[in-house]
A protein has these predicted regions:
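Aromatic-lined carbohydrate-binding/catalytic grooves of carbohydrate-active enzymes
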Residues: 117-227
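Catalytic and substrate-binding clefts that recognize carbohydrates or anionic sugar/phosphate headgroups
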Residues: 1-121, 130-132, 136, 143-148
Length: 227
């Protein structure tokens, strides 16, 4: 183990475990590793667009491992050992469980972190989304075509650039003039709408100044300043 003092009463910690070469490791959230088995991969422990880390894995050797240190860090799954690194924590904290199946291991994990409620039926239906629908008419026409063809459409997603300025968190009225009518029409089709908020805020947005004043922005990844 490595336990080095840092600023603000924090420590840089590293913990190594022996790992057999034939072990297969799965999990760790959403990471573009190019494969399912994480053996041989290095996972950076931070969140960003299209990278969503959950520091929990299951092993073909019958155990699950949760790295319970909320800080920037790294997980290294080498041929002969596994190393967990935290760049700023107050103690080394991890949880290990075992089971006869992956399902049993995952059940133990949920016992300590919380069980997710069952999704409503509509949420397991077909979701239609693309990077951008430019206008309300374009968005509605896609849903109407689904209906004309008799295809089920559970959720229709309004994604990128539906705003005037990013961070407004409302539809641009120049291109989405009547949201209430749009919602009513899709509701009559049995389709729900989901809007992807895109949580960036540009300086031209009406929300930038009040959020900046209240210190609501996150900092850079190294914690040195606001973004």
């Amino acid at each position: 183990r490595v336990f080095k003092p840092r600023e603000n009463d924090l420590f840089h910690v590293e913990t190594d475990f022996a790992a057999p070469a034939d072990e297969r490791l799965y999990g760790m959230g959403l990471n573009a590793t190019g494969g399912v088995n994480l053996k041989g991969c290095v996972i950076d422990l931070y969140q960003r667009h299209v990278k969503h880390v959950v520091p929990f894995l299951v092993s073909s050797k019958g155990y699950g491992f949760l790295w319970n240190n909320p800080s920037l860090g790294r997980a290294e799954f080498a041929h002969n050992r596994t190393r967990w690194v935290s760049r700023g924590c107050r103690q080394i904290d991890y949880y290990i469980t075992t089971g006869d199946s992956y399902a049993e291991i995952m059940e133990h994990y949920a016992d300590v972190t919380g069980h997710a409620p069952m999704l409503p039926e509509w949420a397991s239906g077909f979701w239609q989304c693309k990077l951008r629908y430019k206008t309300q008419d374009e968005f509605l026409e896609v849903a109407r075509e689904f209906k004309r063809r008799g295809l089920p459409l559970a959720v229709h997603v309004i994604d990128f650039r539906h705003w005037k300025h990013i961070g407004d968190w409302k539809l641009d009225p120049d291109f989405w003039p009547d949201p209430e009518a749009m919602v009513r029409e899709l509701d009559e089709m049995g389709t729900r709408i989901m809007i992807s908020p895109w949580i960036l805020v540009e300086e031209r947005s009406e929300n930038f100044a009040p959020m900046k004043e209240q210190g609501l922005f996150t900092g850079l990844i190294d914690g040195t300043e606001d973004t």
